[in-house]
Regions:
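Membrane-integrated ABC transporters
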Residues: 1-31, 46-59, 74, 78, ...
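An intracellular "coupling" helix at the cytosolic face of ABC transporter transmembrane type-1 domains
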Residues: 12-15, 102-106, 119-128, 132, ...
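Transmembrane helix-loop-helix hairpins at lipid-water interfaces of multipass membrane proteins
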Residues: 17-70, 150-155, 268-272
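Hydrophobic alpha-helical segments in the permease module
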Residues: 59-71, 161-166, 238-252, 269-294
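ABC-type nucleotide-binding domain
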Residues: 328-553
Length: 553
């Protein structure tokens, strides 16, 4: 896998990452200076008269303070960069997920997408800011230590890195694949946790009604435990990599130094200070080697996140987003010509469907379950694309119209009202936030919602809970209808929009809406007599086609 996403985001924040990397390099310079100064100080204390102890001590303290200051700056700037990268990643991921077609959301678990935009993007932002940006300083510390070892004693200075570095690569080779597999398992387990929580919280009434709280609690607990165990295993390995690599490198260096006491090896020492410096740089070399090992482990974990993000970002947005055609207010003439459609892995629902709805016509679709009523609605709203055939609006192929401009021609009320967790007003003005108070009241009255809204202590400011949980089914439908009526589009689509109304409320709605719907194209999916009475034409869909049950001028 090519880390294209990693490179793209690194390039986007190259200024911040380069600055962090530059300060990290300055910190590594201070780090490299300290062993030499410490060795000079130790030699001076041991009696080397050629060393100025005061000057050496001052330089050592300066290097320590500089390293501390640089490390603090790196930590603060890394946290700031991580926050900005995380915000950008989440925003871009959310925007792209929103642009994906409904068919994508139907074939992917909500928990996977929630895990992606919340937890997985955090891994990538942390890797970019806290790990990758500090790589230059770590590499410089390791490289500088190797160069200085060679300058002090070319013999041992060459042998130490030749034995220490292979320890790093062997360890990484052995653990890299294991970390990648663990990373994938952790992501799947976290997605399960999100999915179970989302599903169970939306099913609380059913879970309580069937008294299955214990089963769902245990299922969720099992998902949490699986995720915990996998993350613990992953943490153990990543925690193991750096220190153990450092230990093995240190033991290797010690073995080389011991062997260096043999005749002919290490005989070039010129002073005690150089001996101390060689020992200090040998010890220093093990730290960046361990850090590089830890960075490699983090990269293996992050690779899985990058692969998952690339899969989502590579999924194409809805085709209509690329269309350039604009749409003024439509007259509402709709035609489906030779339309075929089948859901993935299922038999065809529509085969060669030809259906025309005139502008201003009210058409009711009836028929048994599964004959394609809702499928027609999904195709009209471009939630799905037909496998064959053509759909036009006022004679224009809808695939040539910008999908957002096209959908603004519709007022859609689904069978299951889709409501925000905010106030009644926020739900009614959804997409029409600048609506005037009198417009909101009129739409609510037409939907037979104003009486119950005005009876509430906070009226339109009443908070209705997630998905309108604090309202009855009929009240939720009334708010959804008010939302569509406020939009005042040329075309309405009502999918069992009054199925939760009482008979009196439905009759009042039909009576009030006769004038409002005049001149509008309306497509109804309903079996209720009061709503059917609105229709100019009633069409019965069957597995083999359709026929008019009622046709009046």
């Amino acid at each position: 896998m090519k880390p294209a996403l990693l490179l793209r985001w690194a390039h986007r924040y190259r200024g911040s990452l380069a600055l962090i990397g530059g300060i990290s390099l300055l910190s590594s310079l201070a780090t490299l200076a300290m062993p030499w100064l410490a060795a000079q100080l130790a030699a001076g204390i041991a009696g080397d008269a050629g060393i100025d102890l005061g000057r050496t001590l001052a330089l050592l303290c300066t290097a320590l303070v500089a390293q501390t200051a640089f490390d603090i700056l790196v930590a603060i700037m890394s946290a700031d960069a991580a926050g900005r990268i995380l915000a950008g990643l989440r925003g871009e991921a959310y925007e792209h997920v929103q642009s994906l077609p409904v068919s994508y959301h139907e074939s992917h678990r909500t928990g996977d997408l929630m895990s992606l935009v919340s937890w997985e993007v955090q891994n990538l932002s942390t890797f970019l800011s806290a790990t990758l940006a500090q790589l230059p300083g770590t590499v410089m510390t390791a490289g500088g230590a190797v160069v200085l070892l060679f300058l002090i004693d070319p013999g041992l200075g060459l042998v130490v890195p030749l034995l220490v570095v292979p320890v790093f690569f062997i360890g990484m080779r052995l653990l890299g694949r294991r970390l990648r597999k663990l990373g994938a398992a952790v992501r799947e387990a976290e997605a399960d946790v999100f999915q179970f929580a989302d599903s169970d919280l939306s099913m609380v009434p059913a879970i309580k009604a069937y008294a299955v709280e214990d089963y769902h609690r245990l299922r969720y607990a099992a998902a949490i435990e699986r995720a915990r165990r996998l993350k613990l295993t992953q943490a153990r390995i990543t925690a193991f990599i750096g220190p153990v690599t450092m230990l093995l490198a240190a033991l290797t260096a010690i073995a080389v130094l011991v062997a260096g006491g043999a005749p002919g090896i290490g005989a070039g020492w010129r002073s005690p200070a150089e001996l101390f410096a060689f020992l200090f740089y040998t010890a220093l070399l093990t730290r960046p080697v361990g850090s590089l090992a830890g960075l490699y482990g983090q990269y293996q974990v992050t690779r899985g996140t990058m692969r998952r993000l690339e899969e989502v970002f590579s999924a194409p947005s809805e085709p209509g987003y690329a269309a350039t055609g604009t749409a003024t207010r439509a007259t509402g003439a709709i035609a489906l010509a030779g339309v075929d459609f089948a859901y993935p892995g299922r038999p065809a629902v529509l085969c060669g469907l030809d259906l025309a709805v005139a502008a201003g016509e009210i058409v009711a679709l009836t028929g048994a379950n599964g004959v394609g009523k809702s499928t027609i609605i999904n195709l009209l709203l471009r939630f799905h694309e037909p496998d064959a055939g053509r759909i036009t609006l006022d004679g224009t192929d809808i695939t040539t119209i910008d999908v957002k401009a096209y959908r603004r021609q519709f007022g859609y009320v689904p069978q299951r009202p889709l409501l925000l967790g905010g106030t009644i007003r926020e739900n009614i003005v959804f997409g029409m936030e600048d609506a005037a108070p009198e417009q909101i009241e009129r739409a609510a009255r037409l939907a037979q919602a104003w009486d119950f809204i005005s009876a509430l202590p906070e009226g339109l400011a009443t908070r209705i809970g997630d998905d309108g949980v604090r309202l009855s089914g009929g009240q939720r439908q009334r708010i959804a209808l008010a939302r569509a009526l406020l939009r005042d589009p040329p075309i309405y689509i009502f999918d069992e929009a009054t199925s939760m109304y009482d008979l009196e409320g439905e009759a009042a709605f039909v009576e009030d809406c006769v004038k409002v719907l005049a001149g509008r194209t309306v497509i109804l999916i309903t079996h209720r007599p009061a709503s059917l009475a609105l229709a100019n034409r009633i069409i019965e869909l069957t597995p083999t086609g359709w026929g008019n049950l009622k046709d009046k001028p």
